[in-house]
Amino acid sequence: MIDINSIKEALPHRYPMLLVDRVLEVSEDEIVALKNVTVNEPFFNGHFPQYPVMPGVLIMEALAQTAGVLELSKEENKGKLVFYAGMDKVKFKKQVVPGDQLIMTAKFVKRRGTIAVVEAKAEVDGKLAASGTLTFAIGQ
């Protein structure tokens, strides 16, 4: 398990954009992490005040950060940055609301030089909330 302090060492993101709370499992090419979604998230102030729903783009950002933790925790990538290069086949299946625990899985499926492709999914209570293929560039 990777705690929040180690996540902050790997990722440059900070409040309010740090969207990974804890890593539950990690292997060479796959990671499972969680985000506790609370009513105090700043994005709920405007999305939507009477019916708070986590924006889909932030779910995808949380998945990207999950993959980033895996890649940036590797010795050869310490001190580097991971840049979002694209998203494909993104689908949103379930609303994510305050009180949900978002379980995020990212699996690297292809690497070529500094480019990596990840299959990612986010689930709440075992039900698919979002999924997609993410492309990253690893840079200085």
UniProtKB/Swiss-Prot annotation:
Coiled-coil residue windows: none
Major location category of this protein: cytoplasm
InterPro entries on file: FabA_FabZ, FabZ, HotDog_dom_sf
A GO term, aspect molecular function: (3R)-hydroxyacyl-[acyl-carrier-protein] dehydratase activity
Active site: 47
GO CC terms of this entry: cytoplasm; membrane
GO process terms (BP): fatty acid biosynthetic process; lipid A biosynthetic process
Pfam families for this protein: FabA (PF07977)
Top EC class, one word: lyase
Catalysed reactions listed for this entry: a (3R)-hydroxyacyl-[ACP] = a (2E)-enoyl-[ACP] + H2O
This protein's UniProt keywords: Cytoplasm, Lipid A biosynthesis, Lipid biosynthesis, Lipid metabolism, Lyase
Compartments where located: Cytoplasm
SUPFAM superfamilies: Thioesterase/thiol ester dehydrase-isomerase
The enzyme's E.C. designation: 4.2.1.59
Family, similarity comment: Belongs to the thioester dehydratase family. FabZ subfamily.
Role this protein plays: Involved in unsaturated fatty acids biosynthesis. Catalyzes the dehydration of short chain beta-hydroxyacyl-ACPs and long chain saturated and unsaturated beta-hydroxyacyl-ACPs.
Name the record gives this protein: 3-hydroxyacyl-[acyl-carrier-protein] dehydratase FabZ
